[in-house]
Amino acid sequence: KGALTVTFTAPTERGTDRLILRLWPNGGPYASAGAHLFVSRVREGNRPLPVSYPDPTTLVIARPVAAGEQVVVSMNWRLLLPRETGLRMKGGGRSVRLGSFFPLLAWDGNDWALDPSTKFPSAEAWTTPIADFDVRVTQPAHLRVLASGQQIAPGKWRAQAVRDFTLALGRFEIVKGTAHVPASVRVTVGLEAFPGAEPVRLFLRRAILSLERYSALYGPYPWHTYTVVTMADLIGLTGGLEYPTLVYQPATSENVPHETAHQWFYSLVGNDQARDPWLDEGLATWAEAAVNGAPPFPDATIPPEVTNRIGEPMSFWDQFDTRRYFLGAYLQSSRALLSLGPRSQVDCAIRLYVIDNAYRIARPHDLLDALQTFFPDAEQKLEAYGAHF
């Protein structure tokens, strides 16, 4: 359980008639596994605010905010963790994982994001703005917390200019290193012990290599810390989970380059992950080759039912299994980018996309604008793969 205070400033050009926060533990596979996020005592100062719940994942606060006005709203929350493992939230056993676990402001820079949740346990359908987080955590003394941002004092964490906050609680083997991007970034890996777990220093080496390579290609990693937490209940390719400055990996396998690429594509440059999942997943899959030396799964065949559908929303992908979602949205989007021309030029265009859209919620036309600087026929080629602009 906890308490949350949110500060929101409406755009100077227009206001809003409400505030909306999303309660993601109440939807999709989380609710099915027994999770629930309760909210109480929503207030401004000492004044209670009226609220409504159009659906279990949506909290509407009836507080109009004029153009340029700043409002500070507080609330209490209580979370029941899911009974199942392998999700973005985990309780029980020897560890706890909390991802997108508290009421999240759903502002996309222009309006409120009201997309439904997805059925996939490791996928996400949320859109969140850049924010500064100051977090106080109380935990048993024998357990360690690893969290987004920096620990600034015992039990106090600060994460600046990020879209979300996550933490893991448990017993971890810790190793640390430094990436040069070129500024120094403190890299921490926490490994939850598990039979067959990969060596903890493998994760550290791959994290440092990925940060340095992507910083050279797409612009410097802008935060001071980066953390990789490997956990025993996460499995296979779908076990990687990305959050700003912290990612999760299965203890028995490693795909650090993909999750690290999300620090540029989702974290630094945001997107509506329900409407345009190819923007972050396709670009992260594309970027992997810069670290791994070759594109992933070069011999894989795209199933006909998802061929040339890269631009579809999560509501489309929800009808398929995880394998077809990966092949159709992740891998096929990467191949669509490769169809444009030389990889080095595509990387230059993506760097421009990052520069122009850092700390914003990007849309497909923002990526197209950057690509057309180098490839005038980019729209035609990407539309052939099913992109929508």
Residue spans for each PLM region:
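Early extracytoplasmic/domain-onset interaction patches
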Residues: 1-22, 336
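Solvent-exposed beta-hairpin/edge-strand motifs
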Residues: 16-48, 98-99, 138-144
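Extended, low-hydrophobicity, Ser/Thr/Pro/Gly-biased non-transmembrane segments
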Residues: 24, 76-168
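Juxtacatalytic substrate-recognition/specificity segment
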Residues: 135, 173-276
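Acidic/His/Gly-enriched intrinsically disordered linker/tail segments
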Residues: 275-339, 357-360, 378-389
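Pan-zinc metallopeptidase signature
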Residues: 344-389
